[in-house]
Amino acid sequence: MTKVPVSHIRNFSIIAHIDHGKSTLADRLLQATGTVADREMKEQFLDTMDLERERGITIKLQAARMNYHAKDGEEYVLNLIDTPGHVDFSYEVSRSLAACEGALLVVDASQGVEAQTLANVYLALEHDLEIIPVLNKIDLPGAEPERVKEEIEEIIGLDCSGAILASAKEGIGIPEILESIVQLVPPPQDTIGEKLRALIFDSYYDSYRGVIVYFRVMDGTIAKGDRVRLMASKKEYEIDDLGVLSPTQQPVQELHAGEVGYFSAAIKAVEDARVGDTITLAKKQAQDPLPGYRSANPMVFCGLFPTDADQFPDLREALDKLKLNDAALSYEAETSSAMGFGFRCGFLGLLHMEIVQERLEREYGLDLIVTSPSVVYQVTTSKEEVILVDNPNFLPEPNLREKIEEPYVRVEMITPEEYVGTLMELGQSRRGVFKDMKYLAQGRTTLVYEIPLAEVVTDFFDQMKSRSRGYASMEYHLIGYRENPLVKLDIMINAEPVDALAIIVHRDKAYGVGRALAEKLKELIPRHQFKVPIQASIGSKVIASEHIPALRKDVLAKCYGGDISRKKKLLQKQAKGKKRMKSLGTVDVPQEAFMAVLRLD
């Protein structure tokens, strides 16, 4: 490969809400520049996981290098760094934006700006990126490019007079997009002479070569055979394969400032090459790492248990393998009296949790029971120690704790104004604090609430979508911890506490939640030969109870006529048997019961 002057490199990413056509646009750019031959082309070329294709979302980052012959007669190298659009993966988005100098802001011309797009645009503005607005899907009958331009100008404050009208599906506007990338996106700074610093924006595990790291060289040069040091994990490796992604891997000897590529160096796990880490040479180390690195902290926790206890080792192996590819996933073994052995897992958010669960079931053939998700609480004990609790069963007793603090998030919803009332009700019902409301162009409104994360992780998103008929969109970010009167709600079935059903709730909501949960469990647990009591309690005080009546076998069926004492004897024998059964009997609790906590209205 010929060496490219820095002035002829353009690094850009595409920012878009889910479903606004980002992956299709990337496909068209790859085709238009001849990077991928038409015969190799398939839909969503850069989305490699089956799950990404099915859900139509981008989960793992990808990158592609395109050679483009511009109208000014020069050859340019365009590096597209793809970003995931979902709020759970916002840290990955910020890292891939840090590797760029410009971004295409893709907005659906019929839908307008959505909350997720906003969150990512603000990230892009923080990184001082040149933003090029693109209105996609203008071939749709419902497209209103003028209205959407107004909306972008009003909400984001971007000048849209030069916005490109495009339809990725039909291939309209693609040449204009390529030209504007060359004209408007600034080239990287020429820092080839400085000490090597490169930013890792993604890494994945390959079972033959170990971890493959995707990176962007910020300063200096990197060559095959170099010994490099990762500044956050403080580990050193020798590069045995270096190359560029066009989109398939093509080896090269060296890469210099401004270029994007990959390397492998016998790294064992993705944790050792974290997203956002800085690569430098072991011999000539750079003084400071690149700014912005932070380790991904899980926000949502839940228990994963195999339905068949024999699958426990398989579950451990599957989690170990997923962890190689997913540095944000955390897990530790836990035991539950109700469910046996399993794992307590931590995730970035609900989507991340669903994806991990789905991958475990699909790729590793496991059958899982998932307990209700909880968040991390900060508990100050009576000895003035602060401990973090992610499992309701480890909450210290009331006499051993001073206070409990829970994480709060700032939730921003964008909605058509006719749904404002019902979404405000939703915010209030989730202990939300109303912060702000703005009217936007064309009858849309933003609502801002501060809500405890625990209220958001259960079914807030589903509720918001159903109340707004799917039109509202949201994004949230953590703002800190606040003290609240929280209590642990225990559920007892047949006088035995079921640890997997315990939850931490606000004291004022405990009675209602306990009542609703007991009623729900009564519907879901099948009847047994004996009466099954269900109780919800706080400490030793029972606040709600229900009974599942016993199935009654007719023992008198074969007694014709006659002797009452014979019937009495049979009935007493049955009563005795039921009594014994009640003291020894176990109650089967189906999987739906454990998920009931999620679906309390």
Curated annotation (Swiss-Prot):
The keyword Cell membrane applies. Its main location: membrane. Belongs to the TRAFAC class translation factor GTPase superfamily. Classic translation factor GTPase family. LepA subfamily. GO terms for molecular function: GTP binding; GTPase activity; ribosome binding. Keywords: Cell inner membrane, Cell membrane, GTP-binding, Hydrolase, Membrane, Nucleotide-binding, Protein biosynthesis. InterPro entries: EF-4 (IPR006297), EFG_III/V (IPR035647), EFG_V-like (IPR000640), EFTu-like_2 (IPR004161), G_TR_CS (IPR031157), GUFP (IPR027518), LepA_C_sf (IPR038363), LepA_CTD (IPR013842). It is an enzyme of class 3 (hydrolase). GTP binds at residues 19-24, 136-139. Required for accurate and efficient protein synthesis under certain stress conditions. May act as a fidelity factor of the translation reaction, by catalyzing a one-codon backward translocation of tRNAs on improperly translocated ribosomes. Back-translocation proceeds from a post-translocation (POST) complex to a pre-translocation (PRE) complex, thus giving elongation factor G a second chance to translocate the tRNAs correctly. Binds to ribosomes in a GTP-dependent manner. It catalyses: GTP + H2O = GDP + phosphate + H(+). This is Elongation factor 4. The lineage of its organism: Bacteria, Bacillati, Cyanobacteriota, Cyanophyceae, Oscillatoriophycideae. One of its GO terms (biological process) is translation. It is a peripheral membrane protein. Its EC number is 3.6.5.n1. Residues 7-189 form the tr-type G domain. It comes from the Bacteria. It is found in: Cell inner membrane. GO terms for cellular component: plasma membrane.
